[in-house]
């Protein structure tokens, strides 16, 4: 992300927000159907879906594509814009600050900036993912004779009415843990893989200054794998906290009590599968826009 870091403070921040928003929206459209399946696997009350394929098949046969796989996309689409804008602007601004005012090593700058970016993003993400998770499992809950909202605004209104404005941040602790550690893994993997690929192929072309398209795509896909693999148990806990209105400790106890250790990894396969194209697109689009 050298192009973004070279610009002035205000100009760079504005461009990071714009470019991050566009990249985030594109990535969300790619990953959302897979995310719906993941959330349903994570939050099922019993072993309704023994496999990922059984969940996909059930969702398609009973709800179709739009209502089944894209239920509740409006909220996370806006959230993806806010999340990625926050991630990239926080990361690049923190990197600039550390580079200018400290003697922290380049790797240290990446790790610290990634953690700061993830922490900031968690504040934006919690309300968005709360609404998203509720909508993604709403059709299942309606089928089980529970009255649930299946639209964004009524869902938000119901949360505020029942729990107040602070209720929108149900699951903040789980999201903070996931995003702070995940931010480190996400940015560090991207920067390290990109630099490694660039350095290796610079031997053939010493004058080449920019990364090739395939290098950006591989780096972004690798970052997505690292992020999701490293924080998946925290993501499972967060999903249960938000769909069942329980604390972090109770969510951990409930998951482990019902499914054991493997319960924290339900839906991991499809999550890693979706992580590659979605994150490859996010980083490629962001880097391309930043270079304009």
UniProtKB/Swiss-Prot annotation:
It holds the Pfam family Mito_carr. Required for arginine biosynthesis. Transports ornithine synthesized from glutamate in the mitochondrial matrix to the cytosol, where it is converted to arginine. This is Mitochondrial ornithine transporter 1. Belongs to the mitochondrial carrier (TC 2.A.29) family. It comes from Saccharomyces cerevisiae (strain ATCC 204508 / S288c) (Baker's yeast). InterPro entries: Mitochondrial_Carrier (IPR050567), Mitochondrial_sb/sol_carrier (IPR018108), Mt_carrier_dom_sf (IPR023395). The keyword Nucleotide-binding does not apply. The chain crosses the membrane at residues 14-34, 69-89, 104-124, 171-187, 213-233, 267-287. It comes from the Eukaryota. Keywords: Amino-acid biosynthesis, Arginine biosynthesis, Membrane, Mitochondrion, Mitochondrion inner membrane, Repeat, Transmembrane, Transmembrane helix, Transport. The keyword Cytoplasm does not apply. It is found in: Mitochondrion inner membrane. It is a multi-pass membrane protein. Solcar repeats lie at residues 11-97, 105-196, 211-292. Coiled coil: none annotated. The lineage of its organism: Eukaryota, Fungi, Dikarya, Ascomycota, Saccharomycotina. One of its GO terms (biological process) is L-arginine biosynthetic process. One of its GO terms (cellular component) is mitochondrion. Present with 432 molecules/cell in log phase SD medium. Its main location: mitochondrion.
């Amino acid at each position: 992300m050298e192009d973004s870091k070279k610009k002035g403070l205000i100009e760079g921040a504005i461009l990071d927000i714009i470019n991050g928003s566009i990249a985030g929206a594109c990535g969300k459209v790619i990953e959302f159907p897979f995310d719906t399946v993941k959330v349903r696997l994570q939050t099922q009350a019993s072993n309704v879906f023994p496999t990922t394929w059984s969940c996909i098949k059930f969702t398609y046969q009973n709800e179709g594509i739009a209502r089944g796989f894209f239920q509740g996309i409006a909220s996370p689409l806006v959230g993806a814009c806010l999340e990625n804008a926050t991630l990239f602007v926080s990361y690049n601004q923190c990197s600039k600050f550390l580079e200018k005012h400290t003697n922290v090593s380049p790797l240290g700058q990446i790790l610290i900036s990634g953690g700061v970016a993830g922490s900031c993003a968690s504040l934006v993400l919690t309300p968005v993912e709360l609404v998203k998770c509720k909508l993604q499992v709403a059709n299942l809950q309606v089928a089980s004779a529970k009255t649930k909202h299946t639209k964004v605004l009524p869902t938000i209104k119901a949360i505020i009415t029942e729990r107040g404005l602070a209720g929108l941040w149900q699951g903040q602790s789980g999201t903070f843990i996931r995003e702070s550690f995940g931010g480190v893994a996400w940015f560090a993997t991207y920067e390290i893989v990109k630099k490694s690929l660039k350095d290796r192929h610079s031997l053939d072309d010493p004058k080449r200054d920019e990364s090739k398209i395939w290098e950006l795509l591989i780096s972004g896909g690798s970052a997505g794998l690292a992020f999701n693999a490293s924080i998946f148990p925290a993501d499972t806990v967060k999903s249960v906290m938000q769909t069942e209105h329980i604390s972090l400790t109770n969510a951990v106890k409930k998951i482990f009590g019902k499914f054991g250790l493997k319960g924290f990894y339900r839906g991991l396969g499809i999550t890693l599968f979706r992580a590659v194209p979605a994150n490859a697109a996010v980083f490629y689009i962001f880097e391309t826009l930043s270079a304009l």
